[in-house]
From Swiss-Prot:
Source species: Legionella pneumophila (strain Lens)
Residues with site note (Discriminates between blocked and unblocked aminoacyl-tRNA): N11
Protein name (database record): Peptidyl-tRNA hydrolase
Entry's family note: Belongs to the PTH family.
Single Gene Ontology BP annotation: protein quality control for misfolded or incompletely synthesized proteins
GO terms, molecular function: peptidyl-tRNA hydrolase activity; tRNA binding
Residues forming coiled coils: none
Residues annotated as binding tRNA: Y16, F67, N69, N115
Active site: H21 (proton acceptor)
Amino acid sequence: MAIKLIVGLRNPGSAYEQTRHNAGAWLVTALAQRHNSHFKIDKKMQAELTEIDINNHPCRLLLPLTFMNHSGQTTRIISQFYKIEPGEILIVHDELDLPVGRIKLKTGGGHGGHNGLRDITAQLGTGEFHRLRIGIGHPGHKDLVHQYVLSRPSMHDRQQIYDAIDRGIAIIPIVLSGDIARAMNQVNA
């Protein structure tokens, strides 16, 4: 099944723009820029939206205007409006359980403690969507997680995250064609 919607999870606003938690939005923004596509704010949809077309595979890109914990509402509104099934959605998000700079593509599963994924799963009524997980590393203790995800990465970590984003963008044409298994083999290796 081809991907028709890519969602970059984030917290909106300049205070959060450069935080680890916004790594998903970094990838989706970079993807739009590489295809000379510009986001437009749609307040009714609670989102910034744009479209790209790669090899005759059109896809909408979404950056929610809601905070991370309410990403599901925007994702549901957009998917219902455009008649996009959960299996046609790719959620791009930060991942504590991957080392900084790793990136993995996954289909389905639980939320793994990620509140954005938790809300999307609740709003869509299923976890059977695709996820592109960008490793941001773990602070070592669960009590430090909140502060960690809302902090800016070091220059070294930021570069590793950008390198992972480049690898993620490289598989998007494969993902849009619907060959998820091939994309997984390429990026998860």
